[in-house]
Structure formats: C-alpha cells, structure tokens
Amino acid sequence: MNKRFAIACSGGAALLAAAGAAQGSCGSAFCVLNTNWSTQGVASDPGSFRLDERFEFVDQKHLMQGTKRISQADDTADTTELRTINRNLLTTLDYTVSKNWAVSVSVPVVDRSHSHIANPTGAATFEKWDFTKVGDTRVLGMYRFDNEKNPVVNQGLMFGLKLPTGDYRVSNADGSVAERALQPGTGSTDFVLGGYYSAPGIHLDSSWFVQGLYQQAVSTKEEYKPGNQFQLNVGYRYPLGHDLQALLQINSLIKGRDSGANAEPDLSGSKSVFLSPGLIYSVTHDFQLYSFVQLPIYRFYNGIQLSVDWAFVAGATVRF
C-alpha cells in the first residue's frame, strides 16, 4: 500500500502557530496558521496562563502530481488513494514566566478517516481506517528580547521538542496496520527552532508579524524518519471595530521527503503556500473567538498525493 497524502497543513503549538503546529507528511494534516497573541502584537503579563482550544477540518480528496491535479484513472500505482478527512482538536496551554520567558505545551487529538483501493488493476481491495487518537505533544520555550528603545516591537526565539506521545501502530477493523505516514504519531522526537517579529502596522491599532520555524527529527523508531519541515508565516491584523479584528495571513510550508525502510520517499514531501483570511472577536479583553479559512495558492507534491482545496479553523483563546 502507498499512502500519498498532501501536507495540507502541518502541526503546531501555540508558540509556533499551531502544530505543530503546527504545529504536521500524510499523518500530519494540521493547519499552518498563527493564532498566538504574542506574535500578533498582543502581550501577555508575567504569571499569566493562556488556554487555546482549536478545531481544524481538513478534507483531502483530490489527487495531485507536482503542481497538477490528476484523476484516479491517471494514477497507475499499486494503490489508488480516495480520501482522507481530518478533524483535529488542538489544546494548548501557555505560561508566561516573566517578561522574557514563556513555556507552552500543546496536545492534539486526531480524528482521521482514510480510504483507498489496493491493487486497483488486479484483485481490487477497498481498505479504510477510522480512528480518534492523541497525537504527538509539543513542549516549547520562548524567549522575548528586551527592546527598551522600541517597546511596541515584539521579537524572540522559540525552541523545544515534539515528543512521540502519539500511537504509530494503529490498525483498522481487519487488523491491517496503517502506514507510518497515516498514523496519529510519527514515533520520532523532533527538535524545533524558530523566531518571530511583530510590530505596529500602518493603520491605527493594527499590527503585522513574521514567524519562521524549522523542525527536524533527532530520534526515530522502527525505520521511519519524517522529513524536515520549514514553515514561514506572515500576517497583518486590522481592527474592524472595538471588538472585531480581521487577520490576513500567508502561510508557507516546505516538507522534506520521509526516509527509512517504512517510509515512502518518492511519495512524500511538498512545497505549499496558503492564503488564510480570518476574523477574531474579543468577547472580553482576555477571551477571544476566532475562525479562519485556509486556501492553497501554490502546491507542489513529490509523486502523487492527496491534496486539499480548503481547510477551516475555529477556536477560542482565554488568558487568566
């Protein structure tokens, strides 16, 4: 069987933009999106917590090769991918230790349904996986640089680890173990390093930010190493009223090929750029609701992979 899913999004944690985040290969369909206040020009006080609950819907149902969409008839491999539906719930808790230091823990729950046809030119077999599992946890630190000459500018470094807390041996009802790229966890420990910069915009009470993040597996299990990732997010926040803000982001992701005996390097890795318009509503000073739509504006996939035409994100953030 060949798993060929596009990286519609990649995982993230709050300090990063997602999952992870982020913060996520085929098993990492998370949105590359920044919903963290600290990189959008909204400061957090020392000793405060930030809890973020974020839902993502990512429906991968179109085959692409390179930059072109293809039909199932054009797919001559030994497996024809049909569809992967991802419903992710990402919970992130941040703690601001001081004016310079903060820590973050992010845990995803992955609800994934995938189907394909094995050996489509022979004894075709329909196979499907449905599971809801905890994914890989990210533990991150953030250091904010002092800037006494220009205190409205916010800049810093992010660093930490993605830990192998997610299962990587999930099987379907027939006992067939899903391939590693489909699993809720990669089985790897990854090092994460990034930086951010935010400053006031050209309009009153607006702001802009740029954020970069690099992730690489440093410890792996059972002959599978996920490809290195680099993501770059640029965004502008503009107030539409006292409580409502518009946010427009450009999110890019470069994902290297997976490697190892249980990987498929020819069918993994991609380069993607997304346009992400959204709205943020402040219920109170410390409680926000947000929603975004993520639209691909450039995609290139190694081999044949499932891709997504749009993704949806909605969530709530509270500081206390």
Language-model segments: residues:
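Residues that define the transmembrane beta-barrel architecture of outer-membrane proteins
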Residues: 47, 85-89, 131-137, 153, ...
